[in-house]
């Protein structure tokens, strides 16, 4: 429970000069739950450490009136102002004395954000004092560094039970409809964990060995309580084995309908929120948390709330300890990751970096105190080792029982247990803000040695030195190797034994370290382009800042080959062409970096390639990825685009492939076409990004490619840019500023105003220029000679074949100019276009159909060259759009028949008209 609002109070610092020690309180309360009026008398036994002239208690709230004060049963003067009760003492008072303060009134609650003290509901009264709200309902020296015994005498209505610290010694019937409940503690208690609750309770008793467990619940809560607290005896035994024997005379719970906290660890008697009694042990972590406080917080208490993390770290960490014990180590690690580490990281993402030590008053009970500090304990356990860590946390209980501890004393105990200087560890985690990340470079040599370079990265000025466990593949121990990560980078060497591949190495698999992320510098194979008898590979530079000898490429032939290095020596380049491959085979590739000491990086990702033969035997292919718009000027329908390309291509013989209707293309399909015009005429839904490797392989194999469309350069990935456009930067002109495409070699191209939005004023938006390109076909004319004026607007790239990139969609240019441009550029790319195809010997095939024309069904007869040949039949519109594909197997005499009902592949009836049949047969 916390608030980021500015605190109106500061955490009080321990005052060693008070001159007195309160050894016992006797608190007598008469409570009227209807009027919320209380009568109280608090007796305090005080030992002066030197002669005192006065003593002060805190008692806040304007409606609480002090009636009388006695010192050693004699009336004494007093003042009660601004929440401080000041009592002058006889000048010669040097020995133990007793004060009695009589008071009455309606107690107030403490200010926001806590709003606690004595709390009344319709069916209960209870107290919450953490961090310093005892003073709002009884006069006390309300500071955690002065612990005292406490006896409670609580007078409430006769049908209620009252539960409190210590052992109940009796219940007195007052004969007036009330009873007084007497509770006596035998161990010193800090004021913030003194507390009681009263309600129409029933008692539910348990036993943990000789330890009595008293649970006070409402009758309707009993069944749920018996389930939710069923594991409490085992939990006490488990924590006793870890921390030391349970330290007090009893334990238990008192159920209350509180809304401030989930629960509160009052010494020997936890106050538990009714909302968290589910009957299915859903909130057992709260049970574990509050129980652990009996050792850390109650037996050993932070000297001030500046050190509040000392108690909440152990309680929160104990949630994980119990989960790991009860549900298994893996479940415990999941709990640690999700409910502690990630919970805190999410909180810090919203609230900013925080320091654990000395929080603001309003932030004492925020996640830095709980989840972050619990994470620190877990990392300390890793640093010290299991045996030393648990010895250390037991030493705290043994060294400071019944007393207080400071952060400095905690650190001193840890250093004694671990035998090392832990100043850096605690400086970065307790006294400084931030959560680090870390990056690791893992390398391995052929002699069975590994080298790990760890670098920590901090979002704040905190310099983090991290110990991070790793899991080595094949190791039986998950966290057997611990490496360091420092701001400047730290190198750790270790033997890998028989493990010859560290690819599956895991960084901190059991979540020991509170970190935003762990990353590894791994090689990234960015491109793997298969073409005719070769594979073109490209990769990104190795990110690690280490001296490199170069890069090595490894290849494996499927199905059962082994990876072998195909580069005779480390390469300095970021690409490699493997020409020692055969068409039709499938290969896998990865790349590694090699440093100057002979250590290899972990393998990159694996990519697959299958070189194939490029026959280029089927002429010009037009690929249409336009899905079709609304038919408005800037959103053309598919038919409008088809009509445009039918016009601008004129008499050029070509085949159409509609990606939206016919699906994805294969490299095998492209390998038959020496020229491809790929166009996209929509603002979005671009499909070219899924085909970059395909097109790259096509061009490298000698294919000729012309690309036209909106914004398609934005889809080019780094591998494509590096391979085909080195030194070229595509730059978008987002606004409607393109006036024309200008060229000395080709017809100028102007946007077609009829196809543009009126506000564009005849100018084209979202055009691209190619800064740095060396062979422009066109340059951009920009409105008012604005930015990117005269920059390359259409370029030619030579890479085995030729690629022509237009920084604009050809559809939106004037049709006549576009037609003239294509009439010139297409024969340059593919001189055979429009002439007879290559003369390729082929078997004699026969194809006939009847009736022709037909109304409902067409019988198609095919004659293959040989019996058993595979026969494919494709049906096209006159514009070359494939409507249907059929297949079958020829009979013994090579005959094969099909029937067509006039529907396309989607089952739609085709329009009346003339259709073309294409027959293909294997062999």
Over which residues does each language-model region extend?
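Amphipathic alpha-helical substructures
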Residues: 50, 366-452
